[in-house]
Amino acid sequence: MKKGLLTMAGVLLTVSLVSAGTTVPVLAEEETTLVYGSGDYTRINPAMDEHGEINILIFNGLTAHDGDNQVVPGLAESWDFDDETNTYTFHMAEDAKWQDGEPVTAEDVKFTIEAIMDPENGSENAPNYEDVEEINVIDDHTVAFKLEDKNVAFLDYMTMAVLPKHLLEGEDMQTSDFFRNPVGTGPYKIESWDEGQAITLVKNEDYFKGEPSIDKVVFKIVPDDNAKALQLKSGELDLALLTPKDAAAFADDEAYTCYDMKTSDYRGIMFNFGNEYWQKNRDLIPAVCYGLDRQAIIDAVLLGQGMPAYGPLQRNIYNYEDVEHYDYNPEKAKEILEAAGCEMGDDGFYYRDGEKVGFVISVSAGDQVRIDMAQIAAQELKEIGMDVSVEIPAQTDWAGQMAFLIGWGSPFDADDHTYKVFGTDKGANYSGYSNADVDKYLTEARQSADPEV
């Protein structure tokens, strides 16, 4: 079962952040506004959803990450760890306040993590806190977490945004109106939300870590990648994350600054193993792997700014290099199909037990990189005799799809990605992948600080 899941059409990305007008001086008395080209939001709910760009501006966790991805204080000024009892004790800043003026307390922390852990709430982040055995409020500004076992990523997970108990207790954690008008502790607070157009944040003058230097940050909703580049060029945006193709137009323009960053972010085809087709044809997945020319996809879509990926942790110290590499080999792909009993039809496609061999790749609308990758992958697989097509559904339906062009990568410790994406029945395991050996290794890895484990 393991083969084929982690290696499908895998490519690691280099992303380009482009900003405009960086050399224009601003008078001290003028209001400063930064307009960022953002994807759309239906809610701002850090506890239930994956990390969002806007979350860290509105909320704080007990811990935070610095520019080198190291854990630093957030709402907690310090913390202790008792190795004998596996207990973390966090000592919180006493001057932190909610944006409605109420003090932030240890009860808020306990409320937030318990809400995430509650299976009734269906949080994607629940696997991160499976090891929490007890949460004890020592006093208003001290909270202790007793773990069942070691979890080397626990301090990373405490970057989770703390939510206000006094506003959310008794509310539905998925549908509450709070998540359309959130109140946080962070450097910015919501000024307005024009649905489908923009979310405007204004600085929090009472922020406990100091007043921000930029007065307003506008998340302008521009879901289409090409449109972001056009609006950056026209001056409608100050900052945008662009595809390599779109960023190339700004590289030699002195009016813009381009930041190219190597990432652990990857794109790949993930199969829905709950789908009847893959339950019958799982043995054909290696043929898909050999039928994909990853380097050709990188050159065409990313202008060479990437590398073939053969696992989810390739640019991570936890990467294991000796995995099987399904390098491009169309002839071997055909051999696998024929060995499985597939026969070539008059239309140029293989058939198995009278059924055409092929599947549909679903892709999110507006993400041109994924769309382009999926279309090239589909064409490459057609060339080896698999009838593969691409669809762009209006809404994501994980259970109803055969396969999807995914984008993932751990923002900090590898556990944050692998445990909940590939662990059986975990919060972000949309593929339905299940392997008892993998579950065992994932559990062992989160309990060890040794990168070799």
Protein language model regions, located:
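Gly/Pro-rich hinge or "lid" segments in bacterial periplasmic/extracellular proteins
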Residues: D66, Q70, T159-P212, K216, ...
